[in-house]
């Protein structure tokens, strides 16, 4: 909807002061879009794909090369290779180059790192940081909370509705409850037992820990949870009070 491809059922939105319904033609001239699924022409070469998208916006590779050189420079040695023969990371760089070739004011990225290896993902976010420094506004849709935390502002959404908008730091700071991480030798059994622990408002697996959410209005001491778990024959129990992450905040908003 923000890229003016779909009409909204309700509400309104603007891109750079332009209405997404009334000014859709103007918006399409100032935005770049990289879909989640690789959708360039697989039978065209790297260079041919880039030339095609440049021609759509009446520009050339040479005219905007300075903007894409850090990204395109990494795949330029393979410019005669067909896009369908590129690796996942190289396809990603080509798609981003094509989205930038007309020097957009706003760049939309739809889950750009899904299915990409960790090294390429890290490189990609470093590229985005450099693009931001060049004055391009970047809007990223991502299912990865650690990636969301790299953004200046985030909107947590569920079923098309915005639950909260703020900086990552403020969203974590606004977490309204006490949060503890709990670890024992048997995490699945721990999670099952904690689901029946009445003092806990919520509990869920989080890596090698289980996060336990406690309402601040309830009297709670970690020692009481330790005793409760020992009575259930758990050993090597570790309980720590922690600050909330973006993912903790999102889970709480969903509940």
What are these regions (language model features)?
Residues 165-166:
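ABC ATPase "signature
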Residues 23, 174, 249, 253:
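Residues that scaffold the ATP/ADP-binding catalytic core of kinase and kinase-like folds
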Residues 1-157:
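ABC transporter nucleotide-binding domains
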Residues 169-173:
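Short acidic-hydrophobic catalytic motif
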Residues 180-254:
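Short, charged/small-residue-rich alpha-helical element at the C-terminal edge
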């Amino acid at each position: 909807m923000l890229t003016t491809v779909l009409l909204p059922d309700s509400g309104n939105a603007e891109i750079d002061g332009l209405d997404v319904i009334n000014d859709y033609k103007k918006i399409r001239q100032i935005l770049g879009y990289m879909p989640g699924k690789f959708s360039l022409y697989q039978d065209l070469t790297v260079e041919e794909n880039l030339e095609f998208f440049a021609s759509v916006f009446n520009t050339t590779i040479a005219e905007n090369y300075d903007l894409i050189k850090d990204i395109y420079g990494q795949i330029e040695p393979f410019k005669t290779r067909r896009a369908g023969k590129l690796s996942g990371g190289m396809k990603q760089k080509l798609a981003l180059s094509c989205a930038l070739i007309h020097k957009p004011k706003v760049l939309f990225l739809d889950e750009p790192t899904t299915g990409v290896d960790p090294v390429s993902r890290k490189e990609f976010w470093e590229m985005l940081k450099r693009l931001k420094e060049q004055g391009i506004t970047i809007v990223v849709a991502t299912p990865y909370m650690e990636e969301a935390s790299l953004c200046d502002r985030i909107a947590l959404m569920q079923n098309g509705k915005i639950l909260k908008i703020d900086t990552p730091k403020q969203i974590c700071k606004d977490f309204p409850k006490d949060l503890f991480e709990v670890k024992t030798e048997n995490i699945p059994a721990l999670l099952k037992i904690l689901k029946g622990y009445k003092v806990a408002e919520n509990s869920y697996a989080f890596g090698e820990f289980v996060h336990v959410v406690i309402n601040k209005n309830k009297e709670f001491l970690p020692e009481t949870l330790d005793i409760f778990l020992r009575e259930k024959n758990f050993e090597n129990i570790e309980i720590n009070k922690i600050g909330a992450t973006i993912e903790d905040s999102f889970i709480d908003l969903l509940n």
